[in-house]
Amino acid sequence: MRPYDLICFDVDGTLVVHPEEKIVWEILNTRFTGSDTVNRTRYEHYRSGRITYAQWVALDVGDWLAAGATRSEILAAIEDLRLVGGVHGTLAELRRRGYKLGIISGTLDIVIETLLPEHPFDDVFLNKLLFDEKNALVGCHATPYDVDGKARALREIAAREGIPIERCAFVGDAFNDVEVAREAGFSIAFNPKCRELSDVCNIVVRGNDLAAILPHFP
């Protein structure tokens, strides 16, 4: 018998990686503002409560809009993003074993559309970029399910599917995964970027292949 019924994943740093360990927001802010200092400043403002998550998204996307960003420019900027080794095989094997799969992430939909267009996920919670008929960026629908909201998303999926929360698992890597890791019945810190996540997760898994999580999901 499976120990869990649902496994949800973060994306940036968990399923998708960059050679310099950048996430998609850092890449696009640097591309369209010419500097990476805005990332650190807004992150600090968010963590200190000076801005909300929705305001953080609006500020970043506002800069991209001011720069006249287009779909093709965004795709060119993120071309160095790659799937973590073993993603396709691992997800396929988890499905074969009967697990429901989901994404709960602060990433952008264009990342999944580009790198995992035929993904196996039953539920996908992330930020959605909006383009006009000429493929110019016109806005973004900010997910209400990042950081603390990730735990709420997990509860919503579990309730809808009739799955007890203790039979839900989560795999992530960063500060915004801490609360959902606490909420889940089982959590894995995959190549964690912060000590707090390592401390709250049931197990830490390190390596370049997602298949390393499979022994924990028989």
Model-derived regions: residue spans:
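Active-site neighborhood of HAD-like aspartate-dependent phosphohydrolases
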Residues: 1-51, 58-62
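Phosphate- and divalent-cation-binding pockets in alpha/beta enzyme and binding domains
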Residues: 24-27, 86, 110-114, 179-180, ...
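Glycine-rich phosphate-binding "P-loop"
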Residues: 68-81, 138-145
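Short, acidic loop-to-helix structural element flanking the phosphoryl-transfer center
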Residues: 72-110
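Surface-exposed amphipathic alpha-helices with a cationic face
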Residues: 88-96, 150-151, 155-162, 182
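Acidic, Mg2+-coordinating phosphoryl-transfer loop and its flanking beta/alpha structural elements
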Residues: 105, 165-207
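Substrate-recognition "cap/lid" segment bordering the active-site pocket of phosphatases
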Residues: 113-168
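Short acidic-hydrophobic, aromatic-tinged amphipathic segments that line or gate anion-handling sites
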Residues: 125, 203-208, 212
